[in-house]
């Protein structure tokens, strides 16, 4: 049976507050109105997870303006949350919007991989869905991908589909990702994320037409180098569309967490249910780490050792539970 991967994950949200206002967002809170996640709360939540059930700590955040006086404290909290997750035996993956070169370099110390969606490179969206979202400027996001390449950070990016772009725009965005990967070799996966309206977005947009996703997968597979994984979020598509996307070249189902914080109206299926859902297509669902194996030697040694421990565990047991049942790497 052919393999399809997913990452057993748990999402930590340092803050929902965000200075951008993407019209499709169901995540953001107004700056100043949201309490930040404390390290104590985060530790409690991570320690409450059934042992051996989760590998990735996805640190997903709203953004504080780069020039705000609160930026340093915000960044510090993100760094500390990653450091905590690592100490508790998880592998962090951070997506906190565009970061400065120095911030990226710092977070590399405490992350197995990082990510930022390119969304779409057409500047036209800065007049529509992104008109109040300066951090969605294509140049800013392209710059971030370039810096991640220079810093040798295994990186996840992707396209948000159905936000007013054309099919020609998909080609431009995918071509930009392919070009960056040919230069730096750091793009581990590309997410094809269908815009999915939720109950708290500021403008109700149309959902991305599911029939078109298969077409997008085929185009992405043609444009992207073969070593880049293609990720489809299984909670945002129908079971049939998911099978069609796998047949068209999708290889991964992303992080599966108790709650999809970005799209809280769409429950993540449990891994068992997902495995059963794709089995009729001849697909076997297997867990993966947030960093793909070809990047292990880019990691700082403390993270690399942790990663290699997880790899041995998955290959020995073929499943997730560690033999000791212990998930605390401190000891
Ligand atoms: O549960 C989710 N995980 C999301 N993830 C998590 C992602 O699936 C995994 O963290 C990576 O595949 C690494 O394992 C993102 C990660 C990124 O770097 C960029 C965007 C996303 C978007 C989502 C999302 O909408 N929902
Ligand atoms: C973290 C990523 O989640 C995506 N994102 C934000 N809002 C939505 C939505 N309503 N539907 C689907 N994806 C969304 C964006 O692509 C962002 O970069
Ligand atoms: S999608 Fe990200 S950048 Fe846009 S408003 Fe939501 S949290 Fe902020």
How would you name each of these model-derived features?
Residues 171-331:
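Auxiliary Fe-S-binding modules of radical SAM enzymes
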Residues 4-12, 55-59, 92-94, 114-116, ...:
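Hydrophobic faces of well-ordered beta-strands that scaffold small-molecule active sites
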Residues 10-12, 63-65, 96-100, 120-122, ...:
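Active-site-proximal loop/turn and secondary-structure-junction residues that shape catalytic pockets
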Residues 31-182:
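Conserved Radical SAM active-site core
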Residues 21, 123-126, 198-201:
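Short acidic/His/Gly/Ser-rich catalytic and metal-binding motifs that mark active-site loops
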Residues 1-5, 299:
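Acidic/polar, glycine-rich intrinsically disordered N-terminal extensions of enzymes
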Residues 4-41:
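Canonical Radical SAM [4Fe-4S] cluster-binding loop centered on the CxxxCxxC motif
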């Amino acid at each position: 049976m052919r393999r399809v991967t997913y990452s057993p994950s748990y999402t930590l949200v340092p803050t929902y507050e965000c200075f951008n206002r993407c019209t499709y967002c169901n995540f953001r809170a107004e700056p100043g109105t949201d309490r930040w996640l404390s390290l104590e709360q985060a530790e409690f939540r991570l320690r409450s997870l059934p042992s051996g059930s989760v590998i990735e700590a996805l640190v997903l955040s709203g953004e504080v303006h780069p020039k705000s006086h609160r930026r340093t404290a915000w960044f510090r909290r993100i760094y500390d949350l990653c450091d905590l997750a690592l100490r508790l035996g998880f592998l962090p993956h951070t997506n906190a919007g565009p970061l400065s070169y120095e911030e990226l370099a710092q977070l590399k110390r405490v992350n197995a991989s990082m990510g930022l969606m390119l969304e779409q490179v057409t500047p036209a969206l800065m007049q529509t869905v992104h008109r109040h979202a300066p951090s969605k400027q294509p140049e800013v996001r392209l710059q971030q991908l370039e810096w991640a390449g220079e810093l040798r950070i295994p990186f996840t990016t992707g396209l948000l589909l159905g936000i007013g772009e054309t099919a020609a725009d998909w080609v431009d965005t995918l071509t930009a990702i392919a070009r960056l990967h040919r230069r730096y070799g750091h793009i581990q996966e590309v997410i094809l994320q269908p815009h999915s309206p939720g109950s708290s977005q500021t403008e109700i947009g149309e959902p991305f037409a599911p029939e078109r996703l298969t077409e997008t997968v085929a185009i992405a597979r043609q444009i992207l180098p073969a070593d880049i994984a293609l990720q489809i979020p299984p909670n945002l598509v129908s079971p049939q569309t998911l099978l069609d996307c796998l047949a068209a070249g999708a290889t991964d189902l992303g992080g599966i967490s108790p709650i999809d914080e970005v799209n809280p109206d769409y429950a993540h299926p449990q891994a068992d249910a997902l495995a059963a859902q794709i089995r009729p297509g001849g697909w076997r669902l297997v867990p993966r780490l947030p960093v793909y194996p070809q990047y292990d030697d880019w990691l700082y040694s403390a993270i690399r050792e942790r990663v290699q421990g997880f790899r041995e565990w998955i290959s020995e047991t073929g499943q997730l539970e560690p033999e000791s049942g212990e998930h605390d790497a401190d000891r």
